[in-house]
Amino acid sequence: MTIRIAALGVSHWHSIYDAAYLRHLARMPDVELIGVQDSNPAVAAQRAAEVGHPPVFASATQMLDTLRPDFVVALGRHDTMAGVAHDLLERRLPFLMEKPMGLNAKEVATIAERVRAQGSYVAVPMPQRDSAFVRHARRMLAEGAFGPLSHLYIRTNRFTSARYPAWNCEWMLDPQASGGGSLRNLGMHGLDIFLSLTGETACVTGAQFGHHALRTRVEDYASVLLRTPTGVCGTLEVGNTYPRRTTEGVQPGAGRDKLLDGADGEWKIVGRDALLMAKDGNIRIVTADGEQNFSDLPTENPAYHCLASILAAWRDGLPPPVGVEDCLNAVRLIDEAYVLGNATAV
């Protein structure tokens, strides 16, 4: 069965940059990209030209009414996401939506409530769930290798947020449209992994935000402290101050984390009996008996794999790999951090 997919809000950079959803959809077997939409038709036409010239629409309503897709990929500005999600739910269309699904937890909660009531298929792409770090962490947790957990440390520092205007997403630097900076965007991944691996809820115990390097209205750096009810601690660092901007289309070098190409990233989970760390595509495991160091890079593009998994789960009648509730849990922590750190956010 060929899945007929329409994409909304394709001026979002993930349409053809970074995760590059449209590029992956265009080369997937049994998938047809039947149309793209954006309120900026010139940008939509540029995006369409990169992926085989599917029909371009300025109106989401017109595209959905005309094409009647099987599945929708919903991108767009953060301040429009909740409205788009509710429209798709009203139409009973299955879809994936880019995080954070709204400006704040209040907006995302309305989506989650409706998804629960309808039983709709709504997925949130989180490729870090399939990373080497998470795979090894889950294996070691299942084996009881860590003993009681102590803490997780997650750092994601990507290159300058000046990339957003260059990619037709200048709204990302406006807190009223984006809901925040590096924490609202990049922090989702680390918070989701912290919650997923601990299997617990968490609260924010400390937060600070920096604007000093890039001098934009949204933060270019954030650090957040977390703690679960059982006492597992977490430290999250996110930023847009990596000094080198990678060239789109260039294959990452052997020493770089392909999930965060061109980034300064580190992922660590520590217990009484073991430590697991991922950095620059390498895995380090330390126990009382010794130490292992080895490379573990993905064999296929993580975003492609994530998209394929989402579509396969829908086709097989299974729940999405990551759903709205998962997104909401992370967004709530982001909101807590902004309040605690007295940062400018919606």
Predicted regions and their residues:
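C-terminal helix-rich "cap/oligomerization" subdomain common to oxidoreductases
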Residues: 1-2, 62, 71-73, 120, ...
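N-terminal Rossmann-like dinucleotide-binding module
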Residues: 1-51
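Hydrophobic residues in well-ordered beta-strands that form the structural core
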Residues: 7, 97, 122-124, 236, ...
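Predominantly a Rossmann-like dinucleotide-binding segment in NAD(P)-dependent oxidoreductases
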Residues: 12-17, 128-215
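Active-site loop of classical SDR/Rossmann-like NAD(P)-dependent oxidoreductases
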Residues: 16, 277-278, 297-308
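Beta-loop-alpha module in the N-terminal Rossmann-like domain of NAD(P)-dependent dehydrogenases
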Residues: 40-42, 51-114
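Rossmann-fold dehydrogenase core element
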Residues: 110-128, 148-151
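Contiguous beta-strand/loop segments that form the cofactor/metal-binding neighborhood of enzyme cores
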Residues: 185, 191-281, 306-318
